[in-house]
């Protein structure tokens, strides 16, 4: 069991490039492929480095500054989050603060545009 812990520790310390190279070496030695059949059908041969840089699918909207129209920003935050007026005001007062998480890109962009229309500064992460 101690040997497995050592191996786990060594693997955890590898960089992404080193891990990709290790995958290639093991695939060649064992005659197997780490690519799943679904990925092969949809994307061809998968590159581990490319998978790590895949397009982001979930976004977080972060209010960084309120601008001049703080009351309008509070109203929009209240509508978007479903918070009460006091909670929405507190969230706005504590900027920079995440407003909503795990959003699709289109929904995150829509929220960002609504807030920026009032003069607020917003980031998507």
From Swiss-Prot:
Query: What biological-process terms (Gene Ontology) are attached?
Result: translation
Give a yes or no for keyword DNA-binding in this entry.
no
Q: Which is an annotated GO molecular function term of this record?
A: structural constituent of ribosome
What keyword terms does UniProt attach to this protein?
A: Ribonucleoprotein, Ribosomal protein
Instruction: Extract the InterPro entries matched here.
Output: Ribosomal_bL12 (IPR000206), Ribosomal_bL12_C (IPR013823), Ribosomal_bL12_C/ClpS-like (IPR014719), Ribosomal_bL12_oligo (IPR008932), Ribosomal_bL12_oligo_N_sf (IPR036235)
Q: Where are the transmembrane segments?
A: none
A cellular component term from Gene Ontology for this protein is: ribosome
Q: Name one Pfam family in it.
A: Ribosomal_L12_N
Q: How does it assemble?
A: Homodimer. Part of the ribosomal stalk of the 50S ribosomal subunit. Forms a multimeric L10(L12)X complex, where L10 forms an elongated spine to which 2 to 4 L12 dimers bind in a sequential fashion. Binds GTP-bound translation factors.
Per its database record, what is this protein's job?
Forms part of the ribosomal stalk which helps the ribosome interact with GTP-bound translation factors. Is thus essential for accurate translation.
| Family, per entry | Belongs to the bacterial ribosomal protein bL12 family.
According to UniProt, the name of this protein is Large ribosomal subunit protein bL12
Organism, by scientific name, is Rickettsia typhi (strain ATCC VR-144 / Wilmington)
Gene name as annotated: rplL
């Amino acid at each position: 069991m101690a040997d497995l812990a050592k191996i786990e520790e060594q693997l955890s310390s590898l960089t992404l490039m080193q891990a990709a190279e290790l995958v290639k070496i093991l695939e060649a030695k064992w005659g197997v492929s780490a690519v799943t059949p679904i990925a092969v059908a949809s994307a061809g041969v998968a590159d581990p480095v490319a998978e790590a840089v895949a397009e982001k699918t979930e976004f977080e909207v972060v209010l960084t500054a309120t601008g001049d129209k703080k009351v309008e920003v509070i109203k929009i935050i209240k509508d978007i989050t479903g918070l009460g007026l006091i909670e929405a005001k507190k969230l706005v007062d504590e900027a920079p603060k995440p407003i909503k998480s795990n959003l699709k890109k289109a929904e995150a962009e829509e929220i960002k545009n609504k807030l920026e229309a009032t003069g607020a500064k917003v980031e998507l992460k």
